[in-house]
Amino acid sequence: QRQMCIRDSNPSYEELENSYLDMVVAGTEKAVLMVESEAKELNEDLMLGAVLFGHQEMQAVIKACTELKQKAGKEDWVLNTDEETPVYSAELTEKYSEQITNAFTIKDKTERTAAIGVIKDDIVSSYPDADEIQLGKVLGAFKNLEKDIVRKNILSNQPRIDGRDTDTVRPIFIETDVLPSAHGSSLFTRGETQAIVVATLGSSRDAQRIESIEGQSTDNFMLHYNFPAYSVGEIGMPLGPKRREIGHGNLAKRAIKAVLPDVEDFGYTMRVVSEITESNGSSSMASVCGTSLSLMDAGVPLSSPVAGIAMGLIKEGDEFAVLTDILGDEDHLGDMDFKVAGTETGITALQMDIKISGINESIMETALVKAKAARDHILGIMNKTISKPKELSENAPAMKSFMVDKDKIKEIIGKGGAVIKSMQEQTGATVDINDDGMVSVFGQNQSSMQECLAIIEGILEEPELNKVYKGTVVKIVEFGAFVNILPGKDGLLHISEISNERTENVNDVLEEGQVLEVKLIGFDRGKMKLSMKALIENAE
């Protein structure tokens, strides 16, 4: 059970860090216009209550703005009445209503767009003497007619553009592990919207460094959303991400953040890329579903799967219809884009944009209830494909963290970093050590990590008297040879301990780089004394 409180002022940065909800609400005196939020699996009643509370609290600011307008504001502009557009609207309605109505019964987006294009070309050709301004008014009347026809059909309980009723989610197709070499991947298709989502795991060093007005920080979870022109049948230069792509990526990221494991439990840096290959409504929510699937496919221990759905609204006067899983045309011709993402337990992200003067509590409540039903439906399909995180992929990097005594840190690092650099070059692994003695080993694969761990274990191991070690000759001197038996630990094999027989010249018996077995027979002022002769005597 969660205990919560509501503050009547803006929260501090510290409070937001520990808050279950971060929400921005914009509106007028009478209605809500925009909501942007992220949450930690809150139920629909709490989210609705937060929106209404935000609307209530903004009234003081609205009142102050109204008072300022009365004191210092200017008169409102009076727009000139456009007398031509209504005439064009009447002409187009009489001649093209039936054709447009039939076009909007075509379920396939490409075919429907082509049919609408033919009608549009016919309209343009029927006004050969129209100048640019007049033609603009004609096309404006055409768009209004499109909008009126689609909206009236929906409000009169007729099938939507693709034949669905207001509550049905489009057919969903899901695959995971579609890119076997990737750490995690998924293909999420809902109707004519499709996303290929790939998850990549990296070390803590791969975390994104952020400098903001709040200070410096790092982010171990990155989500990049790409919307290429071909996904909507267009062409264009693949330049850097635009505002829309950044916004959609941030929304999907906020939806997933609530279910990510703590850094202490899962030290990987996670990067997800959602590539939209086809789009006809709510590719951002497809990215949410695909991200959840790909992270679980990569073995990331999410606390719960996350799904997202986009809701729409058609409103005329007091009549309204809330649409589940809107198409691109329904988004364009409708009054609201209401995106809800979350788990079976609750909502993790909510975004709402309104094109009309605002919506009331009843509409928001209806939208949230319908979104919950749709989200549960999608989660049910997702869980049939993958219901819990897999084991880490063989292609994924391997990582292990453990604590060591603080006085051992310098031994692992070595003088001038020599030991840790050599270790990383030899194994290809990355080693991070913090001041508390937390050591994190990150290998390109299991064997790389295990090789590095073995070296560290050797460094931490204390030489044991009378134990036999396999060592490497690192240096030959006149009186013997120095043999490395543990990482960073060399002992002296005296010339008298090489053999039972007298050895005149060490170079006649040993050479640098030679691997041999030696026994630790004692310590001389902290220095290790090694023997090969002791092994021969034991064998005899």
Where in the sequence are the language-model features?
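Short, small-residue-biased leader/transition segments that mark boundaries at the very start
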Residues: 2-6
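Long, charged amphipathic helices and adjacent flexible linkers at domain junctions
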Residues: 72-75, 79-86, 377-403, 450-470
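Long, amphipathic alpha-helical stalk/connector segments used for oligomerization, subunit docking
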Residues: 350-370, 374, 378-385
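Glycine-rich, flexible beta-strand/loop modules in the N-terminal catalytic cores of phosphate-handling
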Residues: 29, 36, 178, 183-268, ...
